[in-house]
């Protein structure tokens, strides 16, 4: 189902849709942003097409209303907003060979962590399960919003902040102050074409 008829102006709003997913164990999903070719960001697609064209798909964040609970709706929304604004997971799912392009976020093997969780007896000791063994041999407490359970999920790092700021200032289809005039997308059904670029 396309939600394009429900989408508000992507230059002014981040569209969040809440509905029942076919995939029952997914809490949320999000589109990643584009960056201009002239000012790209590692890991994100450089595409100038959306500076002057609206996408044919629904560029948004989606939250699963059957899987999400009252306890984690806030962290799920914050996590999906992180993706929408250019952030990746702070872990690897293929041993330790993935990156989030942020030097100040320790990486760890999520599959190894999940296997370790399977050896524990429930209920878990939260102070034990928030610990991670990093890919460089270090131990740390998981606090990053871009991690999965079990984590405090209440922090971003300086490098993550820089990535988000870059996206806000340079990317099409993202609200926020822009560094260049071409990052505003014309939407004639909302703003007349002559005034669409601010």
Q: Model regions: which residues?
A:
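An almost-null, non-specific background feature
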Residues: 17, 23-28, 70-72, 94-96, ...
């Amino acid at each position: 189902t396309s939600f394009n008829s429900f989408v508000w102006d992507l230059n002014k709003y981040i569209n969040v849709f809440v509905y029942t997913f076919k995939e029952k164990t997914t809490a949320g999903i999000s589109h990643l942003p584009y960056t201009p070719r002239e000012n790209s960001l590692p890991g994100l697609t450089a595409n100038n097409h959306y500076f002057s064209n609206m996408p044919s798909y629904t560029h948004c964040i989606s939250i699963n209303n059957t899987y999400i609970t009252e306890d984690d709706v806030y962290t799920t929304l914050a996590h999906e907003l992180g993706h929408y604004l250019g952030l990746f997971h702070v872990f690897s799912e293929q041993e330790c060979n993935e990156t989030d392009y942020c030097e100040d976020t320790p990486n760890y093997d999520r599959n190894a962590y999940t296997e370790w969780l399977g050896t524990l007896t429930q209920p878990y000791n939260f102070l034990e399960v928030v610990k991670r063994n990093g890919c460089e041999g270090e131990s740390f407490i998981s606090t990053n919003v871009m991690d999965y359970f079990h984590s405090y999920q209440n922090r971003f790092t300086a490098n993550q902040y820089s990535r988000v700021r870059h996206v806000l200032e340079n990317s099409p289809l993202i609200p926020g102050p822009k560094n260049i005039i071409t990052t505003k997308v014309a939407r004639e059904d909302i703003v007349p074409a002559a005034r669409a670029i601010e």
